[in-house]
């Protein structure tokens, strides 16, 4: 049975972002949205349901920093001085409420081959995806929201959730509230996900054949209708030449999202 816990909510006076923490503390807080530093703050306490399980991280803050540095090093034409703009202290960890959907899908397809022959077939597959359980746009930076809306799920990473596993003294550890039901999330995104998986499976089956008037009819059977989980992510923002850039990774370091500056002079020199 899910337990409830008291979370601390702080509204940033600079950008009005609502920041949610597991614990109350006294040190300086940095807003991950606008980077405003708050020395004094008034926290509001809210009751929230805690999930029974979470995706346990396999990298820590240092691992995230190494992943970010290595990724940028491997990208062509990244300015050499970009690392001077990255503040190693401005790395945030956030445990996002997400819903887990698992099940199987089947798809029947038909079409006309290159020789006018009628073609048809059946395919099936498994699905295991995580969807963000928060639809309130002001709660998260846009880049983080876009990245975490839907992600594949790693079954091996699940553990029982205990708030004691989280560092109560770290102001860079955040969470956010669940604001939408599992049924509403699946109604909003489930059909799109099923259609995408079905099309990919059918195209894999068809291979290089040319098929006209392709019709795809998928059905899905869920064995997990949206189990609530906490899923950790790391993210960092930095400014270079007055432009903001970000680097985001899941707690396993398997899924990344980032943008980065490009040295245009170096890039144009190589092209020429």
Q: Where in the sequence are the language-model features?
A:
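Short cysteine-rich clusters marking metal-coordination/redox-active sites
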Residues: 12-15, 31-34
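Residues immediately within or flanking Cys/His clusters that coordinate Zn2+
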Residues: 7-9, 28
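Charged, low-complexity helical/coil segments in non-catalytic cytosolic or luminal regions
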Residues: 4, 41-244, 262-269
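Short linker/helix segments within small regulatory modules
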Residues: 21-29
């Amino acid at each position: 049975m899910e337990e409830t816990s008291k979370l601390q909510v702080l509204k940033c006076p600079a950008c009005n972002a609502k920041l949610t923490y597991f614990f109350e503390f006294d040190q300086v807080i940095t807003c991950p949205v606008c980077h405003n530093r708050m020395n004094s703050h008034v926290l509001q306490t809210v009751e929230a349901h805690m999930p029974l399980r979470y995706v346990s991280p396999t990298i820590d803050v240092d691992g995230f920093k190494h992943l970010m540095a290595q990724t940028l090093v491997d990208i062509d034409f990244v300015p050499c001085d970009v690392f001077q703009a990255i503040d190693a202290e401005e790395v945030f960890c956030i445990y996002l409420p997400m819903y887990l959907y698992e099940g199987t899908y089947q798809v029947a397809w038909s079409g006309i081959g290159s020789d006018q022959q009628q073609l048809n077939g059946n395919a099936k597959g498994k699905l295991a995806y995580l969807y963000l359980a928060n639809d309130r746009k002001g709660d998260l930076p846009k880049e983080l929201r876009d990245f975490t809306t839907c992600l594949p799920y790693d079954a091996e990473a699940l553990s029982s959730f205990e708030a004691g596993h989280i560092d109560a003294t770290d102001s860079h550890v955040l969470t956010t509230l669940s604001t939408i039901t599992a049924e509403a999330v699946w109604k909003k995104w489930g059909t799109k996900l099923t259609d995408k998986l079905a099309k990919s499976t059918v195209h894999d089956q068809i291979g290089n054949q040319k098929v006209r008037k392709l019709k795809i009819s998928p059905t899905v059977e869920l064995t997990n209708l949206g189990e609530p989980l906490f899923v950790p992510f790391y993210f960092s923002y930095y400014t270079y030449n007055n432009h903001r850039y970000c680097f985001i990774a899941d707690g396993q370091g398997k899924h990344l999202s980032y943008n980065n500056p490009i040295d245009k002079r170096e890039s144009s020199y190589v092209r020429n």
